[in-house]
A protein has these predicted regions:
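A metal-dependent hydrolase signature that marks the N-terminal structural subdomain at the beginning
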Residues: 1-115, 239-247
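Residue-level recognition of hydrophobic positions within alpha-helical transmembrane segments
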Residues: 22, 56, 122-125, 170, ...
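Glycine-centered structural positions embedded in regular secondary structure
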Residues: 82, 88-90, 128, 175, ...
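Residue-level detector of short, conserved catalytic/binding motifs and their immediate flanks
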Residues: 95, 118-122, 175
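Post-HEXXH active-site segment of zinc metalloproteases
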Residues: 117, 133-175
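Active-site recognition of the HExxH zinc-binding catalytic motif
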Residues: 121-137, 178
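An active-site-proximal "capping" alpha-helix that borders the catalytic cofactor pocket
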Residues: 170-186
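Pan-zinc metallopeptidase signature
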Residues: 185-259
């Protein structure tokens, strides 16, 4: 399945049942990730340090457990700091794919990457989203169904995730799409580009589900150790995602923990 996607998704999307057409826009859009403001978290860290120094000076051992708990909670916030990321492409159910050309140009100019290769890598990512969406429609017998049909509404509800599942659904979607993009870059010889996807400081620090793209790290690590195993893991995630975002998300967490 993964091989079929990578061989056709740019040059022959029709073989995957995908339309070749997509929209292009010159607007610059940013998407915010994380939960906590960096300045506020830094301020909280300084306050904790002062309390620790005061505790050491006064030998107030009784307050140590509470301070330790506060420090643990503060450290968790370091993995959820807010940051913005320039949007390069977008897939929206019912609207299709949009690629943001100026954003792609800006990214390539900043890093010295080949524009055509980076453009196609974004297209890979968004087309995997579209392919995934079509698979969900098919699973709910909603492919070609009327918008007002019960099957279509059920598929739409599932695709976006039901309330608390929304963040988990986003992680699963981005993991499947971004890993395909990362592997496509490797196969095209764009090694520096693929490596950079995992090394942006803010992105490397922020964890799932607050940064859904972080889920790809486990699959990338597995590919390095066993390319055959990662193909099986990818197919497993894809199948799980059609019935349970939660189960697919838990599998991604396991892969990330093992990396």
């Amino acid at each position: 399945m993964l091989k079929l996607i990578l061989e056709n998704i740019v040059t022959a999307p029709e073989r995957l049942g995908l339309p070749a057409a997509y929209a292009e826009s010159d607007v610059l859009l940013y998407r915010q990730y994380g939960r906590y403001d960096a300045v506020a978290v830094q301020r909280e860290g300084k306050q904790l340090l002062k309390r620790a120094e005061a505790l050491q000076a006064d030998y107030d051992i009784a307050t140590l457990p509470r301070l330790a708990k506060q420090y643990t909670e503060w450290r968790k916030k370091l993995q959820q700091l807010k940051f913005k990321r320039l949007l390069h492409g977008e897939f929206a159910a019912g609207k299709g794919i949009t690629l943001y050309a100026n954003a792609i140009r800006q990214e390539c100019a900043e890093h010295g990457w080949d524009y055509a290769a980076y453009y196609d890598s974004v297209l890979v990512h968004e087309r995997v989203h579209l392919l995934h969406y079509q698979a969900v429609l098919a699973h709910f017998s909603a492919a070609g169904a009327a918008v007002q049909s019960a099957e279509y509404k059920q598929a739409q509800c599932y695709w976006y995730g039901r309330q608390t599942e929304a963040a988990q659904a986003a992680v699963v979607k981005e993991t499947l799409a971004e890993f395909a993009r990362w592997l496509w870059c490797l196969q095209q010889g764009q090694h520096s580009m693929a490596q950079a996807f995992l090394q942006t400081p803010e992105e490397a620090r922020t964890c799932i589900p607050h940064y859904p793209y972080a889920g790809v790290r486990g699959l990338c690590a597995l590919h390095v150790s066993s390319p055959q195993a990662v193909v099986r893991a990818y197919s497993e995630l894809w199948q799980l995602s059609l019935t349970s975002w939660q189960q697919a998300y838990e599998r991604i967490k396991q892969l990330n923990a093992a990396k």
